[in-house]
Amino acid sequence: LNRMGTELGQEAQQLAERIFDQAGETFNLASPKQLGPVLFDKLKLADKPKKTKTGQYSTAEDVLSTLAKNHPIVADILEWRSVQKLNNTYVSALPEDVNAHSNRVHTVYNQAVAATGRLSSNHPNLQNIPIRTPRGQQVRKAFIAKDDQHVLMAADYSQIELRIIASLSEDPSMVAAFNNNEDIHAATAAKVFGVLLEEVSREQRSQAKTVNFGIIYGVSAFGLSNQTTLSRSESKELIDMYYESYPKLKSYMSAQVDFAREQGYVATVLGRRRYLKDINSRNAIVRGAAERNAINAPIQGSAADIIKIAMLTIYDKMQQQHFKAQMLLQVHDELVFECPKSELDALTQLVKTEMEAAYSLQVPL
């Protein structure tokens, strides 16, 4: 981590110099008050720049992401922020969190903080170690087993939220794709773009993947266009084709919102409720957020319920069978264990069996 911290510091400096070259001046990159005028007064990246309540130009990540296609400086600024966050939040901070007595990093899990029922983690947050970028993966590699006789083993649910929505909506095409063990993103692309499964291109699969996960969070054509290379009209067309391909998905989502309006809550597969006080709000923005929660909460909440069942049954079986292995972490859809090398095969089989059997859906877990 110390070596990586030095490398990230150098990378941040190089990015800053490139940004200053493109801007034609130096300024404090961490100051929105200085960054805003450079982007919107000098470079004129937007016709009607968004402003904060205090009247400053907004340079929030969601605002800059929508402008990334307008000028290369935006991508460099977002990258600089990413490098700085990685360095400050993880690379520099994690060594400070090592417990002097155990020589380990310990976290605190919160059972009743996230409204969806997910566990959350803090002091430090070990559920948020980045893994989607090569740099983030390097941070994860800093977590190792206690000695060379032990290994870390991780097991996660594959696309559990999509499996849950397929099961809850009972959409025959989506259910069939999972039951046939198809790549759900490729299967979605084949249906949406009207091509054979084996003819799906990498770009088509990528776009289908974005829609698959975005639908759960109520993605709009505007939001989808910001996450892909598609225009807003192309994004709308893709979303429309998606719902045509999975019609029962759309009717399920509408039914969830209607139920929430009438009852004031939605529930997970285990019946755990989330109350939505703003579902009938006269404020369209507030009501829209509650409607998205009406769709998302049963899906995310059910995933949380299912992995908690798995954790309990795995722990019980490990105790009964006198495993020396320990369950270390839950990272939303993933469980991390430290186990003696001699127990690895047996633990792998136990964890796989119990995670798959935790709850019965219309599709396999």
Outline where the language-model segments fall.
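Extended, hydrophobic alpha-helical segments in both membrane/secreted and soluble proteins
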Residues: 1, 161, 185-188, 207, ...
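Hydrophobic, well-ordered secondary-structure elements that form the walls
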Residues: 31, 117, 156, 189, ...
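Conserved catalytic core of nucleic-acid polymerases
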Residues: 99, 106, 112-114, 190-323, ...
